[in-house]
Amino acid sequence: LVHTFHEVTMWIEINPDKKNCIFDPIFIQKAAHESTRLHPSSPVAWRKPTCPVQLPNNKEAKEGDKIIVDLYTCNRDEEMFGEDAKQFNPFRKAPSGQNTYGLSFGLGMHSCIGRNLAAGVVPKEDTNPEDHHYGTVTLILKKLFENKAMPNPDDPPKMDEKTKRPNWGYYPIVFDR
């Protein structure tokens, strides 16, 4: 939620002509998915194969080996998400067969049980905005933007210094009337 709020408000600063996008819930959901791709809640996933498997780096993992998947790096892969993969682009198109939020919610039997609750259902071209399932993150952001929330200019946000992960430790907002 905080990463998406920050990404969108910074994006609007450099794209002021797109400010009205923040009142479109489909746009907000796409922005939430893009932000989730860039800022997965867990930067890695651990898996153990149930049989020997050949990895993409041509190494073989044996049954029971611990395989660490670097989600942070995978979600920023330029071959998968384009030359600007490390940047926030709420209009990014997902590669064929891929999710707009990358691997942030996992896949298959290891997918996050709360994905649809938090992120909603990925919108399609013909999605009806009136009955679409947006997810809680989008709905909260929609209300924040409707009420003119913005970062507090007198009390700037601060990163969490207790972790190496790029997370916000403090992010005050104000409502402009």
Go through the PLM ranges and name each one.
Residues 1-21, 137:
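Central I-helix of cytochrome P450 enzymes
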Residues 9-16, 39, 144-149:
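A generic secondary-structure signal for well-formed alpha-helical elements
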Residues 19-59, 68:
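Conserved cytochrome P450 K-helix E-x-x-R motif and the immediately C-terminal K′/meander segment
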Residues 53-54, 75-78, 111-113:
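Flexible loop/turn segments at secondary-structure boundaries
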Residues 58, 63-76:
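A translation/RNA-centric and nucleic-acid-associated enzymatic feature enriched
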Residues 70-97, 105:
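Conserved cytochrome P450 K-helix/beta-meander segment immediately N-terminal to the heme-binding cysteine loop
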Residues 92-169:
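Cytochrome P450 heme-thiolate "Cys pocket" and heme-binding signature region
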Residues 168-177:
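C-terminal helix/juxtamembrane-tail motif
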